[in-house]
Amino acid sequence: MRIFTRLLYAAPSNMGSAASLSEALALLPPIPLYRRILRVHRKKLDPEMRILGDSYVKSEFRAHRGTENPLHIIGFLTEWQLYAQKLEGDSWIGEKLDQGKLDKMSDQQLGQLYELMQTIQNKDGKGEGEGESEK
């Protein structure tokens, strides 16, 4: 990601939902943010979910490495920084996805989200029988 210094420290007042950005926050550069997310995974997630989360974060940061559009960069960094803050504060447990964000997703993104949900459910043992066998 090629990022200008002025973009790194811009307050993303128009990105994300108003509730999640009640205070203006300075964006972390990509590498420190990446390290912060991996550190939070190490502290907050169980080993199986940490492996899944780490591999997902690595693939997303690799996929967006060549992004040059400033709006995409700010949006990407903002969402990952909010994710890290939620994990650090334990406010993510039991939280549902915002309908506005779901509406903005492309078909490919919705497919990826569905695959992620299936993977998580299979890790928990819920997805194997699709809820038919309860013990």
From Swiss-Prot:
Q: What is its main location?
A: mitochondrion
- Report the transit peptide positions: 1-12
Localization of this protein:
Mitochondrion matrix
Q: Report whether Lipid metabolism shows up as a keyword of the record.
A: no
Gene Ontology annotations for the cellular component aspect, listed alphabetically: mitochondrial intermembrane space; mitochondrial matrix
InterPro entries in the cross-refs: SDHAF3/Sdh7
Q: Name one GO biological process term.
A: gluconeogenesis
Q: Which Pfam families match?
A: Complex1_LYR_2 (PF13233)
Q: Where is the signal peptide?
A: none
Keyword line: Chaperone, Gluconeogenesis, Mitochondrion, Transit peptide
The record's PANTHER family line, in alphabetical order, gives: DC11 ACN9 HOMOLOG, SUCCINATE DEHYDROGENASE ASSEMBLY FACTOR 3, MITOCHONDRIAL
Function description: Plays an essential role in the assembly of succinate dehydrogenase (SDH), an enzyme complex (also referred to as respiratory complex II) that is a component of both the tricarboxylic acid (TCA) cycle and the mitochondrial electron transport chain, and which couples the oxidation of succinate to fumarate with the reduction of ubiquinone (coenzyme Q) to ubiquinol. Promotes maturation of the iron-sulfur protein subunit of the SDH catalytic dimer, protecting it from the deleterious effects of oxidants. May act together with SDHAF1.
* Assembly and oligomerization: Interacts with the iron-sulfur protein subunit within the SDH catalytic dimer.
Which family would the database say this protein is a member of?
A: Belongs to the complex I LYR family. SDHAF3 subfamily.
Stated name of the protein: Succinate dehydrogenase assembly factor 3, mitochondrial
Q: Which organism is it from?
A: Emericella nidulans (strain FGSC A4 / ATCC 38163 / CBS 112.46 / NRRL 194 / M139) (Aspergillus nidulans)
